[in-house]
From Swiss-Prot:
It comes from Bacillus subtilis (strain 168). SUPFAM superfamilies: HSP20-like chaperones. The keyword Cell division does not apply. Involved in spore outer coat assembly. May be part of a cross-linked insoluble skeleton that surrounds the spore, serves as a matrix for the assembly of additional outer coat material, and confers structural stability to the final structure. GO terms for biological process: protein complex oligomerization; protein folding; response to heat; response to hydrogen peroxide; response to salt stress; sporulation resulting in formation of a cellular spore. Transmembrane segments: none annotated. Keywords: Sporulation. The keyword Lipid metabolism does not apply. This is Spore coat protein M. The gene is cotM. The lineage of its organism: Bacteria, Bacillati, Bacillota, Bacilli, Bacillales.
Length: 130
């Protein structure tokens, strides 16, 4: 008689796994571009003319932070006490043909990227905030 091996094992039914997944999906669909963690909250939103990336640097010094914009990747690097922490975001657009403005005011880093295309070529930019 042919028997499926998986039939011999009881299925694990862990409600906590489902609850965790439900919570993650709920947060993702409410705000799919908010990547929040306790150390470096980053938000991406758009207006009719711009994409805007904001990072809360409340607990950081500008000299600790480096921003890298390359292709469609946004990288925020923090160097503190001999350790490096990096946060990366793949974005739904390329930086190489966009007009970009960056400012850091009241401990909020704002990167505004115009939606309109500029005449451009391959592009990569890295800069410290200080």
């Amino acid at each position: 008689m042919w028997r499926n091996a998986s039939m011999n094992h009881s299925k694990r039914n862990d409600a906590n796994d489902f609850d965790s997944m439900d919570e993650w999906l709920r947060q993702f669909f409410e705000d799919p571009f908010a990547w929040y963690d306790e150390t470096l909250p980053i938000d991406l939103y758009e207006t009719s003319q711009q994409y805007i990336i904001e990072a809360d640097l409340t607990f950081l010094q500008p000299t600790q932070v480096t921003v890298t914009l390359s292709g469609c990747e946004f990288i925020l690097t923090v160097k503190s006490s001999g350790q490096t922490f990096e946060k990366q975001m793949m974005l739904p657009f390329y930086f190489n043909d966009k007009n970009i403005q960056v400012e850091c005011e009241n401990q909020i880093l704002t990167v505004a990227v115009n939606k309109e295309t500029e005449d451009g070529s391959s592009f990569s930019l890295q800069f410290p905030l200080s």
